[in-house]
A protein has these predicted regions:
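A contiguous strand-loop segment
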Residues: 1-92
Length: 93
């Protein structure tokens, strides 16, 4: 299980997350520059979605096998981190 931390104080924000990967599992860190697109679609895991016309630069980190990102932050300071959710409830209930 991963741990995520978020702290807000005044006009400052702190975000932290660990990945809980095996010591032998590779993690990739990638910097994507801001771009302007002309209406393409993006292939996500299970569907196509419209591509935003303009994107901000973003720094992302993920295990090599993952599509997308596990941890990241864009040039506007928006941070993301994914978490597994474990439940004893029935799927779809």
């Amino acid at each position: 299980m991963c741990d995520t931390l978020g702290v807000l104080r005044g006009s400052y924000a702190l975000f932290g997350k660990n990945s809980d990967l095996s010591s032998n599992e590779a993690e990739v860190t990638e910097l994507y520059p801001a771009r302007i697109y002309d209406g393409d679609e993006v292939a996500c895991t299970y569907r196509l979605i419209p591509q935003a016309k303009e994107t901000l630069s973003v720094l992302l980190s993920r295990p090599v096998w993952m599509w997308g990102a596990e941890i990241g932050v864009n040039e506007a300071g928006v941070a993301i981190g994914n978490e597994a959710v474990f439940t004893k409830g029935k799927y779809g209930a």
